[in-house]
Amino acid sequence: MMRYAIMQLGPLVLRCVRDRLAKLPLIALLLAAGASPGLADQPALANEQVLRLVTANMPRSLDPINIDAQRIINNGFAEPLVHQSLDGARLIPAIARSWTLVEPTLWRIELQPNARFWSGAPVDAEAVRAALERHQRANPRARALLQGASFRAAGPTTLEIRTAAPDPAFLFKTVTIGIHNAAAAEAMGDRFHREADLTGYFRPTRFIPGELIVGEPFEGHWGPRPRLNRIEARFVVDPQTRFLAMQAGEAEMDGNVQIEQRRAYLRLNRFNFPPVNSTTWNVWLNFRHPLLADAGIREALSLGVNRDEIVGGVLRPIAVHATGHFPAGLPYAIATRQFSDPARARQLLDELGWRPGPDGVRVRNGQRLEFRVLTYGWWHSAAVALEAQWRRIGVGITLRVVEPTASNQIMLDGDFEIATYCSCGSATGDLHGQLRAFYQTGVTQNWGRYSNPQVDALIDKLQGEFDEARRFDLARQIQTLVQRDHALIYVANSDLIGIAHAPRVRGADPDRPRDITPGMFIVAR
């Protein structure tokens, strides 16, 4: 049987990622080096192997199909078929131990032979098939990722996935899809939200939705036993409170280091910051709003964003100017920027018939040019800056500040006008999947409902392209078109610290820096 090479990103991508890491500030590299285990790092006693996480992202449900099942993979409660490396170039085994593309549209996956759900039920090919089909049927985010795929148990631990069209990067689409006992979910109904039957190396011993989850090692897990004996994740929405908890030794991990706290962490010079990948911070525009459907208004809003002020002020020193969807410097990124020109923005709004009113907000035919901006947590400071910048061109802004977990359902419902929602472009091995999620007509995670038939056609073409150079070229063509349409407003590329570890935390996985992984442990005092 003819076998097809599984697509991994080539040497050019890996070299670009290395070059980007080499440009990080020296202090960040030194701090990151501090997280590496040394020869003298002796584990603490068993009763001290506890990691307390403070985070603004807490699960309200343990059911992986629920949009608010936050961090259940990151915290080790659920597992996907595969993980993705930090640079987006490689797949890492999880429930799947190996995989082969045997035909352009057929994947054959060998599962971990000893995998079990927490209930003891086997994680065999039939169970994984049922889990993926349940995601396909009932998970709004996964539905588009798995669209057209069919699943078959070809043996006790052999799963076959047939895609509707050739897709050499298909498995990258599964990295956020938690495998679960679908039969138990159907039998338990709403109880499954609190008592899910998953596969993770940690198993909950206490769960208060949206507030607290405590976990201990699952002794029946197929992989190595975690070195930590307990994890405690608490919802702490205020970033300063998280920082103070870390400073006081009441937490070992801050899962959401925000802009205002990063300098305070650095000044203390005793915390460790595992490097995270750069993302493109963008602003979402809801095309269902009649004013935002106007390309001229979208262009004016983009021109009115003073990116120099944000990059050099609010986000300093962790940001650079954005180009397109993907962070600048990646081989499939584009070089052209969206420009800032408030004078041109005012001129454009004048040409569109919007005249300044008594309070400075523009008016046309009795209608005020004003929008509500959805924001939360770590983007609040940047949203305040945007509010001031847009007021300078005559656009009225009201900030709608919500908790991070609340924002997911708001975006899913389309109940926003403009949003600083963190669904951001980043390095990936699945160019098709990421660009499709953001820009293809009708896809759930295309939150703004942008639509362009030319973009749709290019995304469809990208899906089945095996040649790396042609994939990169198609990705650049797509980005050029969506940038021209102002589908999103690209503001900055940021290497956010993102995660802070207490001095005694060791063993973080460099490919999964945001996660609590089996190799992490607490060193002796």
Protein language model features and the residues they cover:
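Detector for C-terminal structural segments
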Residues: 42, 208, 212, 304-337, ...
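A structural "hinge/loop" feature
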Residues: 55-72, 94-97, 121, 169-178, ...
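Gly/Pro-rich hinge or "lid" segments in bacterial periplasmic/extracellular proteins
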Residues: 85-86, 174-226, 230, 238-240, ...
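Aromatic- and charge-enriched surface segment that lines or borders ligand/interaction sites
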Residues: 97-138, 160, 291-293
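Surface-exposed binding/hinge segments that line
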Residues: 100, 143-185, 206
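Alpha-helical secondary-structure segments
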Residues: 124-131, 156-160, 200-201, 228-230, ...
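Ligand-site clamp/hinge motif
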Residues: 218-264, 387-388, 396-404
